[in-house]
A protein has these predicted regions:
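Short acidic/polar inter-strand loop motif in beta-rich domains
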Residues: 237-249
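Proprotein-processing/basic-patch segments
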Residues: 250-259
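Charged linear interaction tracts used for macromolecular binding and regulation
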Residues: 91-239
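Long, polar/Ser/Thr-enriched low-complexity segments
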Residues: 1-122
C-alpha cells in the first residue's frame, strides 16, 4: 500500500508526513483551490449564473424517516443508507424532469418501497410472514391485520422472553417535487409523514394468538393519487418482571404491502 502524503491531526496538533518540497507543492495547490476562482468552473446557465444542484433523494429520505419515526428503534445503522439507494433509483427513473430537478415519484415505484429492510440481522420476521393476513379499505385510511392461531416456534424466541406482542403500522409518503418558488424539494401532499401504530395484547410465548389488529389514520384523512401507504408489521418480545413488561432487543419489523 502506497504512502499518501498529506496533513493529519494528532491530538490537538497537526502533523505532516510530507517532505518540504511535497509540502510546498501541496500548499500551492491548496491556495489555488481556495482563492483562485478559475481553478474550478461550475456549470453556468444562459445568463452566466452558476447552476445550482439540488438533491431530491436526500429530502425524500428525510420524509421516509419521518414515516418510520416510531420504528427507528428497531432499525440497524445502515437503514438510512438503504433508503437513500431506493430514493436515488426512483429519482433517476424520472425521465420527464429537468436535470438536477427531477421528481421522486414514490407513487409510481411502489415496488421499490416494498423492498425496505429495517434490520438485516433480524430475519425471523421473514420466516413468520406466511402467518400474517392483511386487508385494507378502499380509501386506504384503515387496515386490519388478521392473526389466526398465530404461534411462534421456540427456536425463534430469544432467551429470557416471556411474552410477545404484534405491532401494526401504517404510514403515508407523498411524491417529492422541486418547488421553483421555494427553491427546494417539497412533498406534493401535506399528509406525507403521517403514521399510526397499534399493538396487540401481550401474549405468553408458546400460546397461539387469534386477533384482528386494526390500525387507521385520524378520521377525515383523505389520500390523493400522489400518496402511497406503507403497511408494516412486527413482532416484539418482552420479559415480564415485577408486573412490568421489559422489551428485549431483536424486534423484527417488515413491510408487507404498499398501496
Amino acid at each position: 500500500m502506497t504512502k499518501q502524503p498529506g496533513i493529519f491531526r494528532s491530538g490537538n496538533k497537526y502533523k505532516t508526513n510530507m517532505t518540504s518540497l511535497e509540502f510546498l507543492e501541496y500548499s500551492k495547490t491548496h491556495e489555488r483551490v481556495v482563492h483562485d476562482a478559475s481553478y474550478y468552473k461550475p456549470k453556468r446557465d444562459e445568463n452566466g449564473d452558476p447552476v445550482k444542484h439540488y438533491n431530491g433523494s436526500a429530502t425524500a429520505v428525510k420524509g421516509l424517516r419521518v414515516c418510520f419515526q416510531t420504528l427507528l428503534e428497531h432499525t440497524d445503522s445502515r437503514f438510512t443508507g438503504r433508503l437513500m439507494k431506493i430514493a436515488t433509483e426512483i429519482y433517476r427513473r424520472d425521465s420527464e424532469g429537468e436535470h438536477c430537478k427531477k421528481s421522486v415519484y414514490f407513487s409510481r415505484s411502489k415496488g421499490f418501497l416494498g423492498t425496505i429492510q429495517f434490520n438485516v440481522r433480524v430475519i425471523f420476521i421473514d420466516i413468520l410472514a406466511h402467518l400474517f393476513e392483511w386487508i385494507h379499505v378502499e380509501d386506504r385510511s384503515e387496515a386490519t391485520l388478521v392473526l389466526n392461531d398465530f404461534n411462534i416456534k421456540p427456536c425463534l424466541i430469544p432467551r429470557g422472553a416471556t411474552h410477545y406482542r404484534i405491532l401494526h403500522h401504517l404510514s403515508i409518503i407523498s411524491d417529492f417535487v422541486f418547488s421553483e418558488y421555494h427553491q427546494c424539494y417539497m412533498p406534493v401532499d401535506k399528509l406525507s409523514g403521517m403514521n399510526a401504530i397499534v399493538y396487540s395484547e401481550y401474549t405468553p410465548v408458546g400460546i397461539a394468538l387469534t386477533e384482528a389488529v386494526k390500525v387507521s389514520f385520524p378520521s377525515g384523512t383523505v389520500l390523493s393519487e400522489d400518496d402511497s401507504v406503507i403497511e408494516s408489521v412486527g413482532v416484539e418480545f418482552t420479559m415480564k418482571s415485577a408486573g412490568k413488561f421489559l422489551e428485549l432487543g431483536g424486534c423484527g419489523v417488515m413491510v408487507v404491502d404498499v398501496y
